């Protein structure tokens, strides 16, 4: 057993990645703790090679917080799945004198008030939580091997991915690079040439 990787190891890692012999990357695991809005969690959970454990609203009184953007992206002109991060707006819908960010914040407040009112009236948490919006933050653990983490990062840092999950993938990439700098940098270098 040796502790440090040498030049020969680096060449082998690059060779394995270049030729897609990635089973060796399936024995390196990492567990993350995430705190993201429900809609980001839903996208993340599409990656079924991860193992997840989410904090449940049925069993906890953890403070409820919401993702409240101060500006909104416009719809991408040609990609229906994407938004335009270059053009940020805070529009006033036709029925309001205030901007969208203020309306969203007020909506969150009303939802939380209704949720707490239902709980206080004796409604069980599993039903009361149905009034909470998709912008509510949730916390969960996600465990994944390095091979599938790199695939997740590839897919979710793509410009067509939703901005919020791009930020999540970028944070995962930063941690993965700290843990496995040679492997992650080799993977990114080889993928960038394609």
Where on the chain are the PLM-derived regions?
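Family-specific signature for flavin-dependent thymidylate synthase
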Residues: 1-194
